[in-house]
A protein has these predicted regions:
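Membrane-proximal helix-turn-helix segments that form the acceptor-binding/catalytic region
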Residues: 124-166
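Aromatic "clamp/platform" in nucleotide-sugar-dependent glycosyltransferases that forms part
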Residues: 287
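Short hydrophobic beta-strand element within catalytic cores of glycosyltransferases
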Residues: 284, 304-307, 314
Length: 377
């Protein structure tokens, strides 16, 4: 799009470079392995990342000719100390006033004392008095959220005072942010499929109807985590026996039965999308997502999504005319054919649903919105 950019990330698996680091130009791995390890170890006691800053980027940014946009995304997850980031932004703005700060919020971390995902908890509305779970990401041994929440929110107010513009892919995260920091403080640009994935999807032939029993997909990074994959619901689907064929994609599947096919974790996006393309539906039961791209990707290749009630799933499905359902309804819907599922969830034919979804989740639309946003800063 003609905009020069650099991408700075914390670390990849094991504190090393990301596996895709060499695939892109102008990429910087930022956080030393020891910093990440120290943060991981100490976060469980302190409920915040103690180490990590952007200070070594100061000269690069302030010596760049012309206006600069610093666009932040996920700043938690053991690579940066929030207070250090805010102080860095103050220093940069004082030295180079034509730096603009932008922050895309991919979860609820900006409104809570600790958690990135609320998992139905609304304690943040009353100052995180007592955390109902210590396991919600990022997990801890001791709950200090109530002690930290006021100071953390003050740092976000300081970012707003520096002129930082906040964006979220989802309405429900933007609403939560605006309820604390003021109406209109966070605007919405929905996630879209990245251009490389969109090219893969364009090559996949549409599968109008599969042969045999319904093939149902469940996708998660770690299939053991109940927040992402409702374990009881999957077991109830398994209990349907030869009425369905259940396909899991992800690590550590605890599901074994005669009607289950465990594909493991697929790092090759083309292979994953090709496999999903053969499915009659994707069942989504996560309670801890914001605007999940796996839904956008499945819908874009014409695979109906059967999702249990959550703000995230509701918002994504509504964009293509779909709805969420109860767990009881899931067990009925997974026994239907692909066209019948499309009709039940999206109220239209499979062909019309596919066409509608391909347009709704286009990465090109997201890209154009961001470029327009940058150009109007």
């Amino acid at each position: 799009q003609g905009l020069a950019s650099h991408f700075v990330y914390g670390y990849g698996k094991g504190g090393k470079e990301s596996v895709s680091h060499q695939n892109y130009p102008q990429v910087i791995k930022h956080t030393p392995r020891m910093t990440a390890m120290a943060n991981i170890a100490l976060f469980r006691l302190f409920n915040r990342d103690l180490f990590g800053n952007f200070n070594e980027l100061y000269r690069t940014i302030t010596r760049t000719a012309g206006p600069v946009v610093l666009h932040f995304h996920v700043l938690h997850s053991y690579w940066l100390n929030l207070k250090s980031v805010v102080r860095f932004c103050e220093k940069v703005k004082n030295h180079k006033p034509d730096v603009t700060l932008v922050w895309t919020l991919h979860d609820h971390w900006s409104v809570t004392g600790r958690c990135a995902f609320t998992d139905g908890c609304e304690g943040w509305k009353t100052g995180c008095q007592k955390c109902p779970t210590l396991n919600n990401y990022p997990p801890v041994k001791i709950d200090r959220a109530h002690q930290l929440v006021a100071g953390k929110r003050q740092l976000f107010r300081e970012m707003l005072a520096l002129g930082c513009q906040f964006i979220s892919p989802s309405q429900h995260v933007a609403d939560a942010f605006n309820s604390l920091y003021g109406p209109g403080r966070c605007r919405i640009i929905n996630n879209g499929i990245d251009m490389a994935t969109e090219a893969i999807l364009a090559d996949l032939p549409p599968v109008r109807e599969t042969q045999g029993k319904p093939k149902i997909a469940v996708v998660a990074h770690d299939l053991r985590y109940d927040g992402k994959t409702n374990q009881q619901l999957v077991r109830e689907m398994m209990a349907l026996g030869d009425k369905i064929e259940l396909h899991t994609f992800g690590k550590f599947s605890p599901f074994t039965a005669g009607n289950v096919v465990n594909h493991g974790f697929e790092t090759d996006k083309r292979k994953l999308m090709s496999a999903l393309n053969q499915m009659d539906a994707l069942v989504f039961s996560s309670r801890v997502d914001n605007y999940p791209l796996i839904l956008c990707e499945a819908l874009s290749i014409g695979v109906p999504v059967i999702a249990t009630h959550s703000d995230a799933a509701r918002e994504v499905l509504q964009k293509s005319g779909g709805k969420t359902v109860s767990e009881e309804e899931v067990l009925q819907l997974v026994q239907l054919s692909k066209p019948e599922i499309a009709q039940a969830i999206f109220g239209t034919t499979l062909a019309e649903f596919s066409q509608r979804s391909r347009a709704a989740y286009s990465g090109q639309q997201m890209l154009e919105e961001y470029v327009n946003f940058y150009q109007n800063l």
